[in-house]
Amino acid sequence: MTKYIFVTGGVVSSLGKGITAASLGRLLKNRGMDVTIQKFDPYINVDPGTMSPYQHGEVFVTDDGAETDLDLGHYERFIDINLNKYSNVTTGKIYSTVLKKERRGDYLGGTVQVIPHITNEIKDRVYRAGKETGADVVITEIGGTVGDIESLPFLEAIRQMKSDIGRENVMYIHCTLVPYIRAAGELKTKPTQHSVKELRSLGIQPNVIVVRTEMPMTQDMKDKIALFCDIDTKAVIECQDADTLYSIPLDLQKQGLDKLVCEHMKLDCQDADMTEWTALVDKVQNLSKQVTIGLVGKYVELQDAYISVVESLRHAGYAFDADVQIKWINAEEVTAENMADFAQDVDGIIVPGGFGDRGVEGKIIATQYARENKVPFFGICLGMQVASIEYARNVLGLEGAHSAEIDPETAFPIIDLLPEQKDVDDLGGTLRLGLYPCKLNEDSKAFAAYNDEVVYERHRHRYEFNNEFRQQMEAAGFVFSGTSPDGRLVEIIELKDHPWFLASQFHPEFVSRPTRPQPLFRDFVGASLQASESK
């Protein structure tokens, strides 16, 4: 029978519930378990696809085209699995489904209520994650903090599951904070005690408490938490701030978290072989080289907006024994006069995705600088579009060339709306989303990176290169090195007379892994490192 583990949070948000859940998933997978994982978000939006990155951070796209929470990126990178639309559930999705059923008459005229209709729908999403994947263990992170009004239906649903399928098949892990009061020089356990008290008032007794702290805890403190929270002392797991996220699974293993799970759920499984992971962490903590990448974006104040891009750059660095340093460059502040100052200490420039006109001209200027000064350049999604616009303006001389998204009146719409998008009115869930094939030209940097004729990458866009300008651009030296198999959609562009200048319409950052860097990121960082060493 499938086992279900629920990870909740207390005291404050952003405690690292997602990293805890992902780390546990890695440990159980290395014990031979088939693991899947999901995130429940209490907000009323159907998905984060139309939310501002300032509100939510990155939107992570799955193979099947679901627009999801950034924690799914952590899950995929840690556990090395590809998730799907069942892996991210919001209050908006739950209520939308229940209301559709009510309109169809599925409830036979009954009064639709939070209990049982909403809670039953929540439980169905948990069970479906296990059924669709055939997993031995389903790990579910409950977003938000215990005590939030929005989280109550989710907590009630997972409380009911203990009675529905048996205590030995359900486990609750509660993540809390033990703050360090610098003026007193003390760690305080009282917030954890109150958080667990709140959780217990809702009918959930945690089996394990994972304590986030910036200072080491004493055994007396663990004993105190165990006493007041009614759990075994060995079930109080300390999680100190770490130099690298990838060391967390090893820290949790040392304290026996995976063993506690296996004992509680009566899982007969082997010990976790973490040899490869230990080697990864050892490499990450002892990198001998350094390379600096300038990231030109419009959301740089909130770095979580680019979290998969940053992690992919770091993964690529590991392949070269290099620590990748990110220089955050606000695209709105970039001008033709100051771009050289911004680029003075960078070895490569990356322009990631984004929507809207804010900062676009700064990105175009940064792209021009990289092209003219032979600085390794990597554009992603909007980054490919601005690279195309820049080339049209400054090489072909098409003054005012732009994207129809930014300037609908431009005489030279180098980037235009996809034909299938012209009659679409809704914003949410209507982009070209998910995994699509890309056919590569053999004589190209893209082919050299992948060493394959056809590759599959994840997409999230509504606009595409306008084929009316393709022949003209190609004649001027612009290389279309990757297209859809039918040749209709441009997927990758590059320049031949440049050390490394490449941009993709798709989002390669969504498939990178710490032990298996994405090929384009790998070669971009490699070219940047080479540029650094030749200075």
From Swiss-Prot:
Enzyme Commission code: 6.3.4.2
Residues at the catalytic site: C381 (nucleophile), H507, E509
Any one Gene Ontology cellular component term annotated for this protein: cytosol
Cited Gene3D superfamilies: 3.40.50.880, P-loop containing nucleotide triphosphate hydrolases
Binding annotation for Mg(2+): D71, E141
Key words, A-Z: ATP-binding, Glutamine amidotransferase, Ligase, Magnesium, Metal-binding, Nucleotide-binding, Pyrimidine biosynthesis
Activation and inhibition: Allosterically activated by GTP, when glutamine is the substrate; GTP has no effect on the reaction when ammonia is the substrate. The allosteric effector GTP functions by stabilizing the protein conformation that binds the tetrahedral intermediate(s) formed during glutamine hydrolysis. Inhibited by the product CTP, via allosteric rather than competitive inhibition.
Binding site residues for L-glutamine: Y54, G354, L382, G383, M384, Q385, E405, R462
Pathway(s) it belongs to: Pyrimidine metabolism; CTP biosynthesis via de novo pathway; CTP from UDP: step 2/2
Binding positions (CTP): S13, D148, I149, E150, K188, T189, K190, P191, T192, Q193, K224
Domain Glutamine amidotransferase type-1: 292-534
Catalytic activity: UTP + L-glutamine + ATP + H2O = CTP + L-glutamate + ADP + phosphate + 2 H(+); L-glutamine + H2O = L-glutamate + NH4(+); UTP + NH4(+) + ATP = CTP + ADP + phosphate + 2 H(+)
GO function terms (MF aspect): ATP binding; CTP synthase activity; glutaminase activity; identical protein binding; metal ion binding
GO-annotated biological processes: 'de novo' CTP biosynthetic process; pyrimidine nucleobase biosynthetic process
Class of enzymatic activity (EC top level): ligase
Amidoligase domain: region residues: 1-267
Residues reported to bind ATP: S14, L15, G16, K17, G18, I19, D71
Complex formation: Homotetramer.
UniProt function note: Catalyzes the ATP-dependent amination of UTP to CTP with either L-glutamine or ammonia as the source of nitrogen. Regulates intracellular CTP levels through interactions with the four ribonucleotide triphosphates.
Miscellaneous comment as given in the Swiss-Prot or TrEMBL entry: CTPSs have evolved a hybrid strategy for distinguishing between UTP and CTP. The overlapping regions of the product feedback inhibitory and substrate sites recognize a common feature in both compounds, the triphosphate moiety. To differentiate isosteric substrate and product pyrimidine rings, an additional pocket far from the expected kinase/ligase catalytic site, specifically recognizes the cytosine and ribose portions of the product inhibitor.
Entry's family note: Belongs to the CTP synthase family.
Protein name per its UniProtKB record: CTP synthase
Species of provenance: Bacillus pumilus (strain SAFR-032)
Lineage, top ranks: Bacteria, Bacillati, Bacillota, Bacilli, Bacillales
